[in-house]
Amino acid sequence: MSRWKAKHDKEHYYKLAKKQNYRSRASYKLKQLDKKYSLLKPDYNVVDLGAAPGGWSQVVAETIGEEGKGQIISVDLEYIKPIDHEAYTGVKGDFTTKETQDIIIELIDGKADVVLSDAAPKLTGIKDIDNFRAYDLSMAVIEIIDNILKNNGNLIMKAFQGEAYQEIIKNLKKKFRNVKTTKPNSSRKRSAEMYVIARGFRGSKK
């Protein structure tokens, strides 16, 4: 793909997000993933990790509707502007800590049907450091699901192709019955980001 087309596509989704009142163009990544894989249902309890600014949580809030059967818990170290939806709750905290995980479990009165993570590490431009940070973040998400995801639940997470990418997939295959990777049309083609669809959580082995 040419740089011109990549820039054009990025601007297209940015403008579309502004027009449709989404907080980021990343909203379209989840919409495309859900359309392809049917990941979200109206009565699901969903936890969105690294949720700021809230684009994915907006999509979930649309899906679970106004009946209040499902819930969306958005977690981030940064402040997230609340979403005007009765099923929404924001949590400002570090999802890798037990304290924040306990808050999540209490809020959803059990465990989540789906865990989402579009989180990305802070990049330095130094390849080795950035690869390590991306791997470290992915593994943090994989570890937290033991505590907050229901048996047979699903995980949708961003991962970055690099030296440790296959190690991430290997770890997920140990925990889930089915693992697929994909790149939505709204992702930049030159980007190293991939999205992992992991379904059928086997449950914690602890």
Swiss-Prot record:
Keywords, comma-separated and alphabetical: Cytoplasm, Methyltransferase, rRNA processing, S-adenosyl-L-methionine, Transferase
GO molecular function, one term: rRNA (uridine-2'-O-)-methyltransferase activity
Enzyme class: transferase
Active-site residues per Swiss-Prot or TrEMBL entry: K158 (proton acceptor)
Origin superkingdom: Archaea
Keyword flag Repeat: no
Residues engaged in binding S-adenosyl-L-methionine: G54, W56, D76, D94, D118
InterPro entries: RNA_methyltr_RlmE, RNA_MeTrfase_FtsJ_dom, rRNA-MeTfrase_E, SAM-dependent_MTases_sf
EC number(s) on file: 2.1.1.166
Catalytic activity: uridine(2552) in 23S rRNA + S-adenosyl-L-methionine = 2'-O-methyluridine(2552) in 23S rRNA + S-adenosyl-L-homocysteine + H(+)
Compartments where located: Cytoplasm
GO cellular component, one term: cytoplasm
Biological function: Specifically methylates the uridine in position 2552 of 23S rRNA at the 2'-O position of the ribose in the fully assembled 50S ribosomal subunit.
Family: Belongs to the class I-like SAM-binding methyltransferase superfamily. RNA methyltransferase RlmE family.
The protein's name: Ribosomal RNA large subunit methyltransferase E
Record lineage: Archaea, Methanobacteriati, Methanobacteriota, Methanomada group, Methanobacteria
